[in-house]
UniProtKB/Swiss-Prot annotation:
One of its GO terms (molecular function) is structural constituent of egg chorion. This protein is one of many from the eggshell of the silk moth. The keyword Cytoplasm does not apply. It comes from the Eukaryota. Residues 47-110 are annotated as: Central domain. Residues 1-21 form the signal peptide. Residues 22-46 are annotated as: Left arm. Residues 111-131 are annotated as: Right arm (Gly-rich tandem repeats). This is Chorion class high-cysteine HCB protein 12. GO terms for cellular component: egg chorion. One of its GO terms (biological process) is chorion-containing eggshell formation. Belongs to the chorion protein family. The keyword Repeat applies. It comes from Bombyx mori.
Length: 131
């Protein structure tokens, strides 16, 4: 009887985690990139400390690999959070101006003077103002 009760409680816990979509809070699902750096030795200029839950309603999965310099410009649809796993050895900085409530769901404006000290990345964006 006790074994059936234990199996029942474990099944309820599994269903609750599946329905609620929350993880265990172990930061990036065990990739080893703890708060303040990714552990690969080249992330001194890219300090991020966040432990947000992954999106549960809308999910976009991309398995692209980028090598070399990458500069992103323009308006990007963005709903809530992003879940990124793996080693990300990055340098540079960026700014996000998140707007909502006016019908625009996305990064609505890129800011040039964000105070992050990058001063220009030289990535050849053509003056888009993203760096």
């Amino acid at each position: 009887m006790a074994a059936k009760l234990i199996v029942f409680v474990c099944a309820i816990a599994l269903v609750a985690q599946s329905v609620l979509g929350t993880g265990c809070g172990c930061c990036c699902r065990g990739c080893g990139c703890g708060c303040g750096g990714c552990g690969c030795g080249c992330c001194e200029n890219f300090r991020v400390c966040s432990n947000s839950a992954a999106p549960t309603g809308l999910s976009i999965c991309s398995e692209n690999r980028y090598k070399g310099d990458v500069c992103v410009c323009g308006e990007v649809p963005f709903l809530g959070t992003a879940d990124v796993c793996g080693n990300m050895c990055s340098s540079g900085c960026g700014c996000i101006d998140y707007g909502c409530g006016n019908g625009c769901v996305g990064i609505t404006r890129s800011c040039g003077g964000c105070g992050c000290g990058c001063g220009g990345c030289g990535c050849g964006c053509g003056g888009c103002g993203c760096c």
